[in-house]
From Swiss-Prot:
One of its GO terms (molecular function) is NAD binding. The gene is mhpF. One of its GO terms (biological process) is 3-phenylpropionate catabolic process. Its EC number is 1.2.1.10. This is Acetaldehyde dehydrogenase. Belongs to the acetaldehyde dehydrogenase family. CDD domains: ALDH_C (cd23933). Keywords: Aromatic hydrocarbons catabolism, NAD, Oxidoreductase. InterPro entries: Acetaldehyde_dehydrogenase (IPR003361), Acetylaldehyde_DH_C (IPR015426), NAD(P)-bd_dom_sf (IPR036291), Semialdehyde_DH_NAD-bd (IPR000534). Pathway: Aromatic compound metabolism; 3-phenylpropanoate degradation. NAD(+) binds at residues 11-14, 162-170, 289.
Length: 316
């Protein structure tokens, strides 16, 4: 099977890490162009040193390059506002181009590979939610495939050092997009997301807490589903792990809790604690929040490339 050529828009932390992953390991993708807006950026400099074509003129620069004619898939690691413009420009120039959105813009459907990649592999634009979403939504989905979930709340704690300008500029979009994806992909009736930028030195790894309120069900079945889901995520994010055993608490009918926007609740509370260690391809190991985004986007692009090859009649 021939490799599908890809471009990355955004030469910051996420874009650069993604480029290195593709260059080092990928079997189905060929890194063709790195796109930025700062000619002095480290990402563009690294791309040039690694033999990748570059432009510092943004999406317009990409479309003016001869390499653009052969690009099948574009990763966008800019910002939510920029992605809307990038999608419109690329779609006008090449209607069938595939975009993998690593911003909270969410023009296309949310994609969490271990939960719903197969049903979205032929979409022209997919959104990778957020780092917190990629880490925690699989856990919500693991519960919701066993029992009805009324409410899910996630707290994503990431090292402040790992949060670049793009992350900081999109905090509101982070919470909104993640909350919505907890419902749409995770299967919760109501979702809530909180992000914490941890200033600790030395920087700590990404930690995530997931609280799920559901109807009562077999705790063994729920725990087994969660463990199975965690193993599935580890297939493309090796540093993803449960920090401790799943904890349960039964909330009795005569002592319900009040959930804003939901009302009174009684049933089962499931608590999951996660840790995500980065692969340290470009970023430090503590930046698991960025690694899970690039790894999830890469897993999505690989499936897209295989789907495109099948449609073209190529052997896998």
């Amino acid at each position: 099977m021939s490799k599908r050529k890809v471009a990355i828009i955004g030469s910051g932390n996420i874009g650069t890490d993604l480029m290195i992953k593709i260059l080092r390991h990928d079997q189905h993708l060929e890194m063709a162009v790195m796109v930025g807006i700062d000619p002095q950026s480290d990402g563009l400099a690294r791309a040039r040193r690694m033999g990748v074509a570059t432009t510092h003129e943004g999406v317009i620069g990409l479309m003016n390059m001869p390499e653009f004619a052969d690009i099948d898939i574009v990763f966008d690691a800019t910002s939510a506002g920029a992605h809307v413009k990038n999608d419109a420009a690329l779609r006008e120039a090449k209607p069938d181009i595939r975009l993998i959105d690593l911003t909270p813009a969410a023009i296309g459907p949310y994609c969490v590979p271990v939960v719903n990649l197969e049903e979205n592999v032929d979409q022209l634009n997919v959104n990778m939610v957020t780092c917190g979403g990629q880490a925690t939504i699989p856990m919500v989905a693991a519960v919701s495939r066993v029992v009805r979930v009324h409410y899910a709340e996630i707290i994503a704690s990431i090292a402040s050092k790992s949060a670049g300008p793009g992350t900081r500029a999109n905090i509101d979009e982070f919470t909104e997009t993640t909350s919505r994806a907890i419902e749409v992909v995770g299967g919760a009736a109501k979702g809530k997301a909180i992000i914490v930028l941890n200033p600790a030195e030395p920087p700590l790894m990404m930690r995530d807490t997931v609280y799920v309120l559901s109807d009562e069900a077999s705790q063994d079945d729920i725990e087994a589903s969660i463990n199975e889901m965690a193993e599935a995520v580890q297939a493309y994010v090796p540093g993803y792990r449960l920090k401790q055993r799943v904890q349960f608490e039964v909330i009795p009918q005569d002592k319900p809790v009040n959930l804003p926007g939901v009302g009174q609740f009684s049933g089962l509370k499931t608590a999951v604690w996660l840790e995500v260690e980065g692969a340290a391809h470009y970023l430090p190991a503590y930046a698991g929040n960025l690694d899970i985004m690039t790894s999830s986007a890469l897993a999505t692009a690989e499936k897209m490339a295989q789907s495109l090859a099948r449609k073209a009649g190529e052997a896998a």
